[in-house]
Amino acid sequence: MTIAKELLIKHEIPLPIEDELPLGGEIVSQYLAPLSSLPEFKPHIHLNSKVISIGRKGLDKVKTFGREDIPFVIHVQEGNAFHMYETKAVIDATGTWQNPNPIGSGGIDAEGEQEAKNQIYYGIPDVLGKNRKRYEGKTTLVVGGGHSAINALLELAELQKQNENTKLVWALRKNTLSEAYGGKENDALPARGKLGSRIQELVQTGKVIVHTPLYIHSIQRDSNHKLSVLGVKDDENHMISGIDEIISNTGSRPNFNMLKEIRHASDPSLESVPELAELIDPNIHSCGTVRPHGEKELRQPEKNFYIIGAKSYGRAPTFLLATGYEQARSVVAYLTGDIESSEQVQLRLPETGVCSISNVNKKEATDNASCDSEQLEGKTTVGCC
């Protein structure tokens, strides 16, 4: 980040305002786009390029002798052409956003999900911009209980103010809505806490119909292209009908297809980098606090190959951009020979979120939390997990 800042200053490009919290599009327009256009970077950036596979030159995964001395080969499709690049090291920062989880509650497609895919958006659509016509005056079901779902609902609520025929429906698996609201004003990340407060206010107005806990198993479409979602709620069959569009925010997972010839490891449940699993497991850490980590924790069986960023967290939902920046800094420092710098993890994350002992087994929380046991005696403990 320091080098990027120095280069922007060198080329007299205005820096983003440090005290503002940018939206995703603003990160691109104010920071990534100007940075990528600089002569120091532009020749080395390949857009519209898909990595097909990564491996060692002339060796498959089985071969060991001399493996660490042989360069990596990256096979890339760029438009209609195919290219190969040899490299000393590979950092996989491809994320998980393009590999969303399905709507089915068991981690697999709901019956009929593929047939209804033209009416399902995976991710957060630009509700008030380019996707406006898709949702204005329609009944939209948002599936998911995390911050992405909350963002989508809040955008739809703004659209509802402009067109009262816009209807909002929310389906999630959480036992209580308070779990979705999170820490609110007690969250050490104020902007995230505000999301919880805003969605609670929206629910209390009655302008969004909530179905929870709902475990979806199938989606049906009638002759008028209206969707019905079927599942189980409170041990009984439950159906939501009259749906025009579905926004699916059920999380995402890593895709390892391009790594078939790389010796890589992942946690069996989270699909995260193994050394991170205990730090980020949502079964243990309900509030998402993760201690700082760097190159050492991110090492893979394949020397000089690393998975960083959201993909390093696998299916865990608690990744923060600041974590990824520090991961990248530490790994690059190590690869360039600055071992001392790579070991000095500079990031200090705030104690994020709120641990509710009512939602976590008390003994388990005590055994795994990083706070002392006296803190756990209260019903709610700020930032203890």
Give, region by region, the residue ranges found by the protein language model.
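Feature captures the FAD/FMN-dependent oxidoreductase FAD-binding
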Residues: 12-99, 210, 217-229, 242-245
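Cofactor-binding loop segments of dinucleotide-utilizing enzymes, especially the Rossmann-like FAD-
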Residues: 145, 171-173, 310
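C-terminal, flexible cofactor-proximal segment of oxidoreductases
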Residues: 212, 253, 268-385
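Glycine-rich active-site loop/strand segments that organize a redox cofactor
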Residues: 1-31, 111, 119, 123-129, ...
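Short glycine-/acidic-enriched loop or helix-start segments at secondary-structure transitions
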Residues: 101-103, 152-153, 180, 257-259, ...
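A Rossmann-like FAD-binding core segment of flavoenzymes
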Residues: 42, 49, 53, 157-268, ...
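Glycine-rich dinucleotide-binding loop and its adjacent helix/turn
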Residues: 24, 31, 92-162, 168, ...
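Mid-domain beta-loop-alpha active-site segment that forms a flexible
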Residues: 30-32, 145-155, 194-198, 320-327, ...
